[in-house]
Amino acid sequence: MEELCFDNQRIWFDPNLLQEDPKACFDASFWQQQGKVIGSAQGRGTTWFVQGETLPMALRHYRRGGLFGKLIEDAYVFTGWEKTRCAEEVALLSTLAVGGVNVPRPVAARATRHGLVYRADLLVEKIDSAKDLVDLLQQAMLPDHVWYAIGRTVRKMHDLQVCHTDLNAHNILVDSRELVWLIDFDKCYTQEGEAWKAKNLSRLHRSFVKEQGKRNIHFSATSWQVLCQGYELPDN
């Protein structure tokens, strides 16, 4: 990653992935004016999907959730550039990618300081042909080898001592090759020890049960059993 420092901003970017102007690429209007917006998704604000010169990307502005987010929508206390949410997520994604976990490649990040607080943006690779696991499970039951692959992917993440604080079915993608991807590592971190891993896995199980009741997804005790086999057993 290269780094730009100017005025009240810090920008990190990968010159091999980003051919556009790093100072302009975090504004949705920049992409709209070029006709390069290829989609969007709603969550905490809008995630814009844009077509860059080298690859499709997802552009996200960091926003708070919950009650506090209604009071202070997108400002965070500044304690150092490397401790900003965007810088930490870029570092974590890089660690996971090097460790063999399928995650979006970080393209660029920007932190803008305003006195005691800052705001942040992130640009990551958009995974080609990948779909939200919940969307897929609403349509049909997945074959066992995909459930197994989900378990293996989570295990690889845990073996790198990375705790995904929002590990749920929506943050798992499956592409057209049936490769499993993990996304949305905001507020995630590395953690020593082993005890937390079972709790993290239980969190994922609760999300499947929740979506089964809410959206009637195709999920069963057998599905979870195969996922756990993938988590517990070594690769063949």
From Swiss-Prot:
Primary localisation category: membrane
GO cellular component: plasma membrane
Class of this enzyme: transferase
Keyword flag ATP-binding: yes
Reactions the enzyme catalyzes: an alpha-Kdo-(2->6)-lipid IVA + ATP = a 4-O-phospho-alpha-Kdo-(2->6)-lipid IVA + ADP + H(+)
Subcellular location: Cell inner membrane
UniProt-recorded name of the protein: 3-deoxy-D-manno-octulosonic acid kinase
Species assigned in the record: Photobacterium profundum (strain SS9)
Lineage of source species: Bacteria, Pseudomonadati, Pseudomonadota, Gammaproteobacteria, Vibrionales
